[in-house]
Amino acid sequence: MAVVDISEELKSLSSTMGSIEAVLDLDALRADIAALEEQAAAPSLWDDPEAAQKITSKLSHLQAEVRKAETLRGRIDDLEVLFELAADEGDADAQAEAEAELESVRKALDEMEVRTLLSGEYDAREALVTIRAEAGGVDAADFAEKLQRMYLRWAEQHNYKTEVYETAYAEEAGIKSTTFAVQVPYAYGTLSVEQGTHRLVRISPFDNQGRRQTSFAGVEVLPVVEQTDHIEIDESELRVDVYRSSGPGGQGVNTTDSAVRLTHLPTGIVVSCQNERSQIQNKASAMNVLQAKLLERRRQEEQAKMNALKGDGGNSWGNQMRSYVLHPYQMVKDLRTEFEMGNPEAVFNGEIDGFVEAGIRWRKQSEK
């Protein structure tokens, strides 16, 4: 790469980083960190474990964000020195090393730029993810379980905390549905682009004749409700059912009636939780899910009114958005962004950052 090209490239990278720093408002983030550190140092912090967990989690996330931005700025500043040294020494290996670092910085900058696109009203929230097996019988149930594993592995790779609230196992294999939380800031803004119907095409391992089977699973992503949302639920409007938790094949995993199912009578919304140790904990988790669903219902009603005013029919969350083809060829393709990967196994193992980043950019472009 010519010296002039390198100089212009480095100026462009520095300018892009400057724009990202302005959007992130690092000074404001540092002030937030200082305030949270003060709260975290309070002797009474763990008097309320749930509040303490939120404070420490948010503090850790903000510290990581600032550290990531500062590190990337340092790498960009160091690039000029790397290329100058390579040129002065006339060393091909040093030049190759500098160019590899340049490519790595480009990629890191692209990833950080995506974070600045998460500016929606609820984007900074934690996320509640629900996956349901749809058409396709046992293959759909197996597919739903693959998607659950995919998202949990993705979260694990990013060191994001997750909590599975409920999993309804299918009789033969897989799951009927599952609900879990991704407990990190901006989880909702990030994962909401995964909402929709996912399609799997493969030779069914459950078909004795080895025929190709198409199956579907639905992914719903909701923001976790906070006190400022004012989602109040009257206990008189709830029907509470308790039952024993069950595992794969209907096998009981608890000897007491600790699982809880809540039915919101005015709307007919039903949620359940069985993964906590006690009935009280399961009810609290189920209430969190119910609040999120009621918030989403309110948002959809408000959006419907806006769409009616604009003459826009809107998009249903059930629209097909991604295909996972394992036969006759191997390809995972997002039908909205055209982003694709030829390694479905890697995708099912949690390597979905490319799809998520492309989805966030596509959504931002669609809003213009």
Curated annotation (Swiss-Prot):
Keywords: Cytoplasm, Methylation, Protein biosynthesis. The keyword Cytoplasm applies. Coiled coil: none annotated. Methylated by PrmC. Methylation increases the termination efficiency of RF2. InterPro entries: PCRF, Pep_chain_release_fac_I, Pep_chain_release_fac_I_sf, PrfB. Pfam families: PCRF, RF-1. GO terms for cellular component: cytoplasm. It is found in: Cytoplasm. PROSITE patterns: RF_PROK_I (PS00745). It comes from the Bacteria. GO terms for molecular function: translation release factor activity, codon specific. The modification N5-methylglutamine is found at Q251. The keyword Protein biosynthesis applies. PANTHER family: CLASS I PEPTIDE CHAIN RELEASE FACTOR (PTHR43116:SF3), PEPTIDE CHAIN RELEASE FACTOR 2 (PTHR43116). Peptide chain release factor 2 directs the termination of translation in response to the peptide chain termination codons UGA and UAA. Belongs to the prokaryotic/mitochondrial release factor family. This is Peptide chain release factor 2. The lineage of its organism: Bacteria, Bacillati, Actinomycetota, Actinomycetes, Kitasatosporales.
